[in-house]
Amino acid sequence: MTTTATAAELGSRPVPPLGGFSFTVLKLEIRRLLRNRRTVIFALVTPSIFFLLFGLNAAYANESAGKGNVSAFILISMALYGSVLATTSGGAMISIERAQGWTRQLRLTPLSPLAYVVTKMLTSMVLGFVSVLAVYIVGFATHKPSMPGYLWIVTALCVWIGSLVFAPFGLFLGYLLPTENVMQFMGFIMILLAFGGGLFVPLSQYPHTLQVLAKFTPLYGVNQLVHWPLTGGSMDMWWVVNAVAWLAIFTVGAIWRFRKDTARV
């Protein structure tokens, strides 16, 4: 059977419900991800260390910040960094599957590009949840962050949901970059985005031009939204527009690269 004949058969194959999305496949993907100890440990340890370094500083940790203190503000920031790092890392692991030829084999199945991207995004979100939980446990154990009890839950959920924006970004990088370089590039890119979105340094300390440019970066909207329950004030709809727009851009990019990669079968 020729490749052309196979492609013709695939084209006439009926599309299954939900584009081939399967909870069985989702469970397998989650297990595969959690077995990667290096990625899991990196996602858990890095943001927790950052919080311990910056969130416990006696010079400012107890200063007021909205409904809590600065330590609580930094806790949310580091949890967000860890969560987006985890979801991006989980997605970027697709580069390993590409090297093994797995994604090309998927072209022989009825699984749609959107269903595959959604499966990978949900898998990455599991790692993101574990990362958020780890940072919040460390923060709670130090007794330094101060905010109302309900905000511990609300902000943690906001951080986790907000990290969804970066799940398809990891997939996009995994399809775009070579296997041997994807993690190095990803780490560098995430640090730049964190600074650009005001995650490590308050945007108020940036020059005016950088403050304006920051509003168009991928982490800006999510960063503002996850801190809003703590800081209060009026919500800027641009935060939502920014987050939704980048989620759409990254998702379209991931689907495009998936189709381009599997089209080589």
Where do the model's predicted regions map?
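Transmembrane helix-loop junction
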Residues: 55-59, 96, 139-140, 144, ...
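Transmembrane helix segments
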Residues: 53-60, 174-216, 220
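Short amphipathic alpha-helical coupling elements at transmembrane boundaries
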Residues: 24, 28-32, 104-108, 174, ...
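Short, intrinsically disordered terminal tails adjacent to the first/last structured region
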Residues: 1-12
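Transmembrane helix-boundary elements of multi-pass transport/secretion proteins
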Residues: 10-100, 128, 132, 144-155, ...
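Alpha-helical transmembrane segments and their short interhelical loops
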Residues: 113-187, 233-244, 248-255
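Helix-loop-helix units of permease transmembrane domains in multi-pass membrane transporters
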Residues: 93-125
